[in-house]
């Protein structure tokens, strides 16, 4: 009898402590999911990964912190795109395209690689890079290259040093670009205010709310356990039922 009471108490505690979670984002790689969870936990939001197999990994959070988690993902521009591999942009078995199209694809890949590299600089949260490349034929005089950068940063005290580091990095990346043709616009990260709100209840019908469903499930489990206990202990026979 004591054993069954302990088991019943354990099930009740599990039902009471069952947290309502909501899927924040899905179809992620392991790296993307880890980056999101790292940012959320640094801001006191509990999150967990769920492996969906071929559908990738999803991240779940408590319903009360869902809105704050969405704000953090927007502020940190998450999830970060997968690492760009230049060889994947030009597979050996692909159809031969025009030189202009090949050049455009190459510069697009370079822009993405540079964006990923700039995030490695301290204080840079995310970055977007645009390169004005010349698509004209070689016999036509080429125009000077310009590079524009929009970066979200996290260290307002070092903004001037950050601009200098970004420009120096890009100048050493492209030998043909002039220092004065590199423009960098810094945008400070938004101030984050944690809010733990009550989840919005989705009423499926007048009687079919989540609380009612959990209550009926708990009662059903208890009834089954009590019936099993009654049959095993002979309670029905002793009471002539």
From Swiss-Prot:
It comes from the Bacteria. The keyword DNA-binding does not apply. One of its GO terms (biological process) is protein secretion. The keyword Protein biosynthesis does not apply. InterPro entries: AMP-bd_C_sf, FliF_N_dom, T3SS_SctJ, YscJ/FliF. Coiled coil: none annotated. It is a lipid-anchor. GO terms for cellular component: cell outer membrane. It is found in: Cell outer membrane. A lipid is attached at residue 18 (N-palmitoyl cysteine). It holds the Pfam family YscJ_FliF. A lipid is attached at residue 18 (S-diacylglycerol cysteine). Keywords: Cell outer membrane, Lipoprotein, Membrane, Palmitate, Plasmid, Protein transport, Signal, Transport, Virulence. Residues 1-17 form the signal peptide. Involved in the secretion of the Ipa antigens. Belongs to the YscJ lipoprotein family. NCBIfam families: III_secr_YscJ. This is Lipoprotein MxiJ. It comes from Shigella flexneri. The gene is mxiJ.
